[in-house]
Structures are given as C-alpha cells and as structure tokens.
Amino acid sequence: ISIERCGFTETRDYLNRYGKSIAEFNAKIDYLFEGFPVSVGIGDGGNEIGMGSLADVIPFYENLSSPPTVTKTSKLIISSVSNWGAYGLVASISKIVGKRLLISANDEIDLIKKIVDLGAIDGTTNVNVNKVDGFNLRENSRTITALQHYLDQSDLN
C-alpha cells in the first residue's frame, strides 16, 4: 500500500505537483510495485504511486501533475486529499474485521502539529503551516469525524 508517495515519471524523475524535482528526497520504492499481483495506491495529484494507472488522462486535467507518475498499482484510491482516501480504506477495513482501527480526529490534529513542528510543509501552499493540502486542521478533521460516525453505526469497539 502506498499513500501519497511520489512515484517516478517516464524519465525516472520524482516531481512534486508543481513539476519541481524532489528526487533527492525520495527512495526509489516504485520497483516494489512492479509486477506485484496485489497493490494499492492512494493519491490526489497525479504524481503518487498508483496514479500511473491513469497516466494517459492526467495531463488533460489542469490541477494535476504533468508529467504524471508512470508507476501503477492493481488498485487505486483517488481522493481530494490522499490522507482522506487512506482514512476511508482504514474505516472499510475496520468494518470488515469488526474492530475500530481509525485514528481519532484529535490524535490526527496532534500528529499534524508535530510533523509541522518538525518542518513538514503543506502540499498545496508549500508553506510550513498546520494545513493538509490547503485545508486547516478543523476542515481536515471533518473527514475522520464523518468516518467515525459511520463506524459508530456499526457498533465497533
């Protein structure tokens, strides 16, 4: 499973959504997904591992990475924010196994604050700020809260 992990382009470079090379910050894990029978990619911008499955159409969308990654996965989850797609997957797995596995909204907020304190930047604004792809902490936590309510209806521990 790859979540929001930059994949290489046709030229084997790693580009952020603005076309800037970030190869020096990326391990070449793309090779782990080649020829593997079952794999999952979760992405939002076109440059993430898995989005190579849509490499032919991504260049036609203004807000997506061009050139896109070419690294494919057997399954692809696309969401407005990659984290949200991952949370949806975890909620689905929670339902299947009958156990609540999803992080709480407060724990997620704490984690975001910690990584920002360590120097992480927001993927949309390119600024060291408590946001996730342009969404502030409150806006971002709404997805987890909604998924937690969904799980509440399932009587999961």
Indicate where each model-derived feature is located.
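C-terminal functional extensions of proteins
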Residues: 48-157
